[in-house]
Amino acid sequence: MTKVITRFAPSPTGMLHVGNIRAALLNWLYAKKHNGQFILRFDDTDLERSKQEYKDAIEEDLKFLNIHWDQTFNQLSRLSRYDAIKNLLLDKKRLYACYETPEELELKRKFQLSKGLPPIYDRASLNLTEEQAKKYIEQRRKPHYRFLVNHEPISWHDMIKGEVKYDGKALSDPIVIRADGSMTYMLCSVIDDIDYDITHIIRGEDHVSNTAIQMQMFEALNTTPPTFGHLSLIINKDEKISKRVGGFEIATLRKEIGIEAMAIASFFSLLGSSAQILPYKSMEKLANQFEISSFSKSPTIYQPEDLERLNHKLLISLDFDTVKERLKEIDAEYIDENFWLSVSPNLQTLRDVKDWWEICHQTPNVETLNLDKEYLKQAAELLPKGEITKDSWSIWTKEITNITGRKGKELFLPLRLALTARESGPEIASVLPLIDREEIIKRLTSA
């Protein structure tokens, strides 16, 4: 049986976002499930936009998610190989030189659209005579090169979409070599997939038409194409998610919001599938349940609050030994198991535990809260004597009700605000024993 080899091929032209991290996760999980290999390739042929800082950030995000690669390379290191294939395809007459300027191509595109026609290249340069080509060269025009798509049916069996069919006539001959000599994604990707024995490729459905063209590229190079799976796009309300939209970067989720690695991995590897989205605690367990056939063809809606809820579920499911190691990473190793168990049921992110430590150990500022001072002083006088325990809250509130007649929100909200300066959070019954008795009285009487 052929060894499964998958790849993830980001362009280092921006930060990883939730759309392409999903592709990275699924390719890694597919390889892991089938005891295969996972290759990280950087598509850095866009010399103007590719930056080392983005490459470093992509690697950092992948390592954070425990997506480890067996091999990595960048396309700029393989230019001589691409050049050799360019010459081969020129000999086979599957590449041809074109001399239109970007402005001329844009005018053609606008004209076609104005006539209600698809913007397909008209092949004006396909049959240029030597004399015509010489004229363009004398005008100091540098050629770009297009791949000649045969006008014949194209089909393949997609792991997610099933049978996919295209008519070659409906596809535009793509530019594969720019006028400055740099290569575009289309042909380089095929050459890499052949040379690195890629067997399976999982990517977004915005690549489906690219795949149709690349099928002919594989054929032109006498190679059987990999098996493809095209994921439905992730959308946020009415807009598909991409690096150009912004606001959905993995770096933002982990650094600014504080989402756990396994929450991100669990959520985006199950989003859009028929499987229940659960907070898995390891990539191995996630790989064991992974089934590419479970993914839907329909667009997938991403709502950040769903990810935050999953993050909460993951946090409260962790044992303290695991949490202890994570607390060191956020410089909160001073937090003990009792404190964690008391506040964790209401944490959204791990870093929230530091906020609650400060709330319990530093008098909060309540000056702007307009609290009922007389009621709070009365409540302070009714605080049960002796050690404060989890039972103290129910004893205390019963006594307050008996004396003041207050119940429900009218009773507990002023107490919560005076003690924590927050309208919500862990149950006060759990928080109360974490605050010194003298501090409780101080907060109630000085509010």
Curated annotation (Swiss-Prot):
One cellular component term from this protein's GO annotations in UniProt:
cytoplasm
Q: Which SUPFAM superfamilies is this protein grouped with? A: An anticodon-binding domain of class I aminoacyl-tRNA synthetases (SSF48163), Nucleotidylyl transferase (SSF52374)
Q: Where is this motif: 'HIGH' region?
A: 10-20
- The main enzyme category here is ligase
Q: What is its main location?
A: cytoplasm
Keywords (alphabetical) are:
Aminoacyl-tRNA synthetase, ATP-binding, Cytoplasm, Ligase, Nucleotide-binding, Protein biosynthesis
Q: Where is this protein localized, as stated in its record?
A: Cytoplasm
Q: List, alphabetically, the InterPro entries matched.
A: aa-tRNA-synth_I_cd-bd, aa-tRNA-synth_I_codon-bd_sub2, aa-tRNA-synth_I_CS, aa_tRNA-synth_I_cd-bd_sf, Glu-tRNA-ligase_bac/mito, Glu/Gln-tRNA-synth, Glu/Gln-tRNA-synth_Ib_cat-dom, GluQ/Sye
A single Gene Ontology molecular function, please?
glutamate-tRNA ligase activity
Could you say which EC number(s) this protein's record lists?
6.1.1.17
What catalytic activity is recorded?
Answer: tRNA(Glu) + L-glutamate + ATP = L-glutamyl-tRNA(Glu) + AMP + diphosphate
Which residues of the sequence carry a binding annotation for ATP? Answer: 243
Q: Gene3D superfamilies from the entry?
A: 1.10.10.350, HUPs
Q: Which PANTHER family match?
A: GLUTAMATE--TRNA LIGASE (PTHR43311), GLUTAMATE--TRNA LIGASE, MITOCHONDRIAL-RELATED (PTHR43311:SF2)
Q: Which HAMAP family match?
A: Glu_tRNA_synth_type1
What does the protein in this record do? Catalyzes the attachment of glutamate to tRNA(Glu) in a two-step reaction: glutamate is first activated by ATP to form Glu-AMP and then transferred to the acceptor end of tRNA(Glu).
Assembly and partners are described as:
Monomer.
Entry similarity comment: Belongs to the class-I aminoacyl-tRNA synthetase family. Glutamate--tRNA ligase type 1 subfamily.
Which named protein is this?
Answer: Glutamate--tRNA ligase 1
